[in-house]
Amino acid sequence: NPEDCWLCNLLSQAFQQKKEYDRALEMGWRAVVLSKGDNDQQINFGYLLYEIAVESPATDVLSHARRWQREYPDNPIVRHMTGAMLNAGHVSQINSVYVRDIFNAFADDFENVLGSLDYAVPSLMAEALEALAQNVRLKKMKILDAGCGTGLCGAYLKKYAKFRGLDGVDLSEKMLEVARRKKLYTRLYNQDLSQFLSRHENGYDLINAADVFTYFGELGSVFVLMFDALKPGGRILFSVSENSHNKDDYFLHLSGRFLHSKSYVEEGLKKRGFIIEKLNRVKLRNEGEAEVWGWIVMARKP
């Protein structure tokens, strides 16, 4: 009965708030089982494991992660989230099916959730473009909003794309439905970003990528594709989260998102031919009690 699994989910949240973590995990797991492995409950259980790992390091979440992995070995959400917990150091990319499913599940609540996290990335990127516009004429650009989601960046990008158009591409069809209702974009594409870029060489004056590289570990390949998709003199503007956990180039955090080192991003851009114009360290959002820091980066194709 689907109502039973949602009841278990609510009980799980209540136990978590009371810091009764073992009972929270028991109810969260029961919700997964009662739903017969429904993706919504898999996502809820994954975030429950992550939040409890952060809130209560003494709680043995890894044994729950191993059981989850054993019971649902073929589910992309389970594979990714248990991978982040059990062997984060060996993961370089995120399964695109996982990204699609997670954003399809969150599409309706996405902007409300980000609002509660003090999510600053779109406004920070808008400021970077405003600063550039003081010195460079930007009004007639063809722009790609890569990983456009619900269109949070579309509002500030649209004014720079009045004549040549603003395109958006995203894996999640449900996020694109929300973006479409805003009527900000000239065209919207439901495609994998790498595949899309490979078909649009010399197509854009600006590629905007807000919080996209949190779902890419290795960045060299996508930097090459973005370089080729830009017209000469074109720019990329993106955010990236800071890896302050270790000395690795990139690191898959317990949250299931990648963090990157500053030197890896800088060297990767230069190696692919970009000229770095801006690299500002900023607070991107809150995550629980913690602040997530990273960089707003702008780089130009000669």
Regions found by a protein language model. Give the residues of each.
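Conserved alpha-helix/loop element of class I SAM-dependent methyltransferases that forms part
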Residues: 118-139
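Class I SAM-dependent methyltransferase SAM/SAH-binding core
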Residues: 144, 150-196
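N-terminal auxiliary segments of SAM/dcSAM-dependent transferases
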Residues: 44-100
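A short glycine-rich, Lys/Arg-flanked "PGG" loop and its adjoining helix->strand segment in the class I
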Residues: 220-235
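Short, glycine-/aromatic-enriched active-site segment of Class I SAM-dependent methyltransferases
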Residues: 238-258
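Short alpha-helix
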Residues: 257-272, 279
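A conserved beta-strand element that flanks and buttresses the S-adenosyl-L-methionine
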Residues: 208
